[in-house]
């Protein structure tokens, strides 16, 4: 019996109910002028995280991928029931695929999801080839594509549904000396300010892979304050 035959989607539905409740509570507390963005991992990324990038048989990959896609589709459905403005699919590990694999394992899934939920789905990846980028540009119902790399992105911003994600190092975010941390943010923002506001349209300020447990909370507040005051 293969893995898929033993899989019960209802068990996942029950497990993820906490997220459904959480989103309802958040949406109810947010004012109408505040956006709520949901997120999930992409199938390839979830597979790599589950296997810790260990080389595993192609048979297991082929059995697992349809299940992951089913789980993600269900999760997206649940999140979009709660009036979120956009759902982002984070798929950093897709850069490990060659162009043929990207066409086979990523593009069909994105087409299906974006067609089911037109202009409600965004996609994030990084360090991909120009060929993969061109494929993403052709997905008409995909609301947003975010690339965590340059890839000539400054020339592409004015003419596509594309955003540039600039990651602020989470190593710097853990600095305990307030002045050193503040100086690091200022240098980061100074580089951004070298471009006109019109050129910065679509830019996203990101904390790389997020806030670590060792990150001082004051640093997170300072980062948000400086980004909002200096780049608004």
Model region roles, listed by residue range:
Residues 9-27, 61-74, 176-186:
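Glycine-rich anion/phosphate-binding loops
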Residues 34-63, 93, 160-172:
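N-terminal small/glycine-rich loop or linker at the start of catalytic domains
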Residues 114-232:
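Catalytic-face loop-and-helix region of soluble metabolic enzyme cores
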Residues 13-51, 150-152:
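Glycine-rich, aromatic-flanked loop segments that form ligand/cofactor-binding clefts
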Residues 1-3:
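Short, small-residue-biased leader/transition segments that mark boundaries at the very start
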Residues 20-22, 97-110, 131, 150-162:
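Active-site-adjacent beta->alpha loops and helix N-cap segments on the catalytic face
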Residues 54-87, 99, 107, 111-119, ...:
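Alpha/beta enzyme core
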Residues 36-39, 80-91, 120-126, 202-206:
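Short beta-strand segments at enzyme active-site cores
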